[in-house]
């Protein structure tokens, strides 16, 4: 990336010099005068452009000019350290690590999880202050962020069907949505992983929709513009029903989570193999999809996620690269969750772990046209295209 920046600076210098050397009616001058007129725009790339509001349109996310957008990034795990829910996450500090280009990280979105049982220790206002620090840091770094209500059904008795969890979810969004409604970089993730019942059928999806639609409405009434991400039962795996039975509302997208080993939890009686194309690929042909969790680690402590770059990382990369309308977020940067990108000293993990592979992948994606926060390289390319009348 550093060599690319040097090339861009040299190209700018040559363009400006040519204006002084060539006559106004020369071919080179005709190409470079528009560039000179837009030099200030190019230089503004060095400070990163403002983040545009996003919206959904068909199967795509788009920016305010209707440019196609793909969001690709990293999730934190919701804990600050081994003390778990007894300490709120230090998002501001974490974000600085993974948006520093000198560290080689190039996400355009970060996921900020808040566990439901954080509220056993902290007030909604305290949780909001923690999230606000993270959201503000993301805004400063010009990256999008997901405010993630990170309930995992089955964890400490959580169950989306219980009156207690339904009330807690409504309380959370009534508090958070109006406070983040004016942030163009904020996306809301409704409920991380509804778990039960473990059925892959339309009835299960429709029962979930009947309950969760009220939560969507609460957010939309308070925050009319922010995209809302909607999961599904079986820990956000029955995404395939979203196109036929969508939720009501604007700027909605649907979530899938996938890990090595999830095929073992996939009900065999439905007569359908666990296959990315069937699980969420076909849905992505019709509605916007965010894979807000996936990852792999050969020695993962977790029952799911035990995979290698060869048997999971490269296949999922190939699958997602063929479908640029699917947005994706890798789980997780933090060393005290699994699978992980880095260790406790922020050393990026390689070999059979995913850190180096994902970091290189994000660098590749950063310069693509679907990145809504364009880097300097694409800013200058746009200027040249403009000068050539493209």
Q: What is each stretch, according to the model?
A:
Residues 1-11:
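N-terminal Sec-pathway targeting helices
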Residues 9-19:
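Hydrophobic membrane-insertion alpha-helices, especially the h-region
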Residues 19-31:
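Membrane-interface motif at the C-terminal end of an N-terminal transmembrane signal
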Residues 31-109, 360, 378-389:
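N-terminal carbohydrate-binding accessory modules
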Residues 53, 78, 87-90, 161, ...:
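Extracellular glycoside hydrolase catalytic/binding regions
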Residues 88-154, 166-169, 218-222, 309-321:
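Aromatic-lined substrate-binding rim segments of carbohydrate-active enzymes
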